[in-house]
């Protein structure tokens, strides 16, 4: 006997996945009312749909800014889509805003994706890990596996798309983008970003009070 699917459950699934009402109802019916299974089914369909669109050219979009409270931290991010129509959509602009906030919240993030990381950085991380004392007595094969895992973890900390979304830790930024691709029907790409910290790279002046007093006496 098929499980009874309530309108409330359908709405909850829609709120959680941003999929259409009919798609949510169908997913719940196919999973016999299992909410988690229905959610996973919709997630996979959304990612599959997004992957099909990922090769399409995206030259429209917006440059979103985020200034943190106090004005000491700011972010600029360029998010691209295929048409100006989608660029003006509230959902797209909300996505860009969330991504800008994500960058502000993750100071370790330096790159959009893995392919942007220079080989020199990867080689340096590998060198650091291989020289750690806790690996000195490990067999070479085991050592290489441990190093590979540590490097991947370190690189993931630098990659925007690998970060857990600050508003929903169950998904990554990559999954958030793909969900919006499924919703809006266009390829969406985070092209580039820049993070600004007030005074970054500048030497702060440290006045010596005693020296200042002596200078004043000589005047």
Curated annotation (Swiss-Prot):
Q: Which InterPro entries match?
A: EF-Ts_dimer_sf, Transl_elong_EFTs/EF1B, Transl_elong_EFTs/EF1B_dimer, Transl_elong_Ts_CS, UBA-like_sf
UniProt entry tagged with the keyword Chloroplast: yes
According to the UniProt entry, its GO molecular function terms are: translation elongation factor activity
- The entry's keywords: Chloroplast, Elongation factor, Plastid, Protein biosynthesis
Tell me which GO cellular component terms the UniProt record holds: chloroplast; mitochondrion
Which residues are the signal sequence here? none
Q: List locations, semicolon-separated.
A: Plastid, Chloroplast
The protein's role, per its UniProt record: Associates with the EF-Tu.GDP complex and induces the exchange of GDP to GTP. It remains bound to the aminoacyl-tRNA.EF-Tu.GTP complex up to the GTP hydrolysis stage on the ribosome.
The record's family statement is: Belongs to the EF-Ts family.
Q: What is this protein called?
A: Elongation factor Ts, chloroplastic
Name the gene that codes for it.
Answer: tsf
């Amino acid at each position: 006997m098929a499980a009874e699917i309530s309108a409330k459950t359908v709405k909850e699934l829609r709120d959680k996945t941003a999929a259409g009402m009919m798609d949510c109802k169908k997913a719940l019916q196919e999973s016999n009312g299992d909410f988690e299974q229905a959610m996973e089914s919709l997630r996979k369909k959304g990612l599959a749909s997004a992957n099909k669109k990922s090769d399409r050219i995206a030259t429209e979009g917006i440059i979103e800014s985020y200034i943190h409270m106090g004005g000491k931290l700011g972010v600029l991010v360029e998010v691209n889509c295929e048409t100006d129509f989608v660029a003006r959509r509230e959902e797209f602009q909300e996505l860009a805003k969330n991504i800008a906030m994500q960058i502000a919240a993750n100071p370790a993030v330096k790159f959009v994706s893995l392919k942007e990381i220079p080989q020199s950085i990867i080689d340096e991380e590998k060198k650091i890990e291989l020289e750690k004392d806790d690996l000195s007595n490990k067999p070479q094969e085991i050592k290489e596996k441990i190093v590979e895992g540590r490097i991947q973890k370190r690189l993931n900390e630098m990659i925007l798309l690998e970060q857990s979304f600050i508003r929903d830790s169950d998904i990554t930024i990559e999954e958030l983008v793909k969900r919006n691709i499924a919703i809006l029907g266009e390829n969406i790409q985070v092209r580039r970003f820049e993070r600004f910290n007030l005074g970054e790279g500048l030497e702060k002046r440290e006045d010596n009070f005693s020296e200042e007093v002596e200078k004043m006496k000589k005047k």
